Amino acid sequence: MTPNEQLFKELIHRHRDLIWSVCSSYRFSAAWETEDLFHEVLCTLWCDFGSFDGRSSERTWVWRVANNTIVSLKRRYANQPAPASPPAAEPASQPDDSPALLQLVDSLGEPDSQIVRASMYGFGYAEIARMTGLTVAAVSMRLTRARRKIKRIYEKQ
């Protein structure tokens, strides 16, 4: 095993729960299972492994690659129907991911759904701003508006 392969293996070992959690939090087309998304993210992480420059934390970088990979796949396969039921196995350390809440988050569109998901995973405004390329003020405003919108929709149900 090469040194890069060993470093990559260690990176995945440290962050596999986060990657799995991000993958399982997306309700995708019926053709895509959480495991398929997980493997797509691993492939993207491997391809981008040399691009990590340390400007953000390793955890932030992994989350951003995972989220962006899934968002790209979601755009590419937008015409396929959503799955009938949520994935079965999910780690206990992930945020509240009830299907109803995730459906509300998905309804926000990008980048608001990405911002809310990052907040659900405990990332701060500055980290989310770096992930999305927005200012901290814009992240704060979008997150506040998104939370209000989710609350209004949830209360109507």
Stretches found by the model and what they are:
Residues 1-10, 20-40, 51-53, 131, ...:
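Short, charged helix-capping/linker segments at alpha-helix termini
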Residues 6, 76, 80-106:
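Acidic, proline/glycine-rich intrinsically disordered inter-domain spacer in sigma factors
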Residues 18, 100-103, 110-114:
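Pre-recognition alpha-helix immediately N-terminal to the DNA-recognition helix
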Residues 36-43, 47, 56-68:
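Structural recognition of an alpha-helix C-terminal capping motif at a helix-to-coil junction
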Residues 41, 65, 115-116, 128-129, ...:
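Hydrophobic positions on the alpha-helical face of helix-turn-helix-like DNA-binding modules
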Residues 51-53, 64-85, 94, 145:
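Arg/Lys-rich amphipathic alpha helix in sigma70-family domain 2
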Residues 107-130, 156:
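Short amphipathic alpha helix immediately N-terminal
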Residues 132-157:
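DNA-recognition helix of helix-turn-helix
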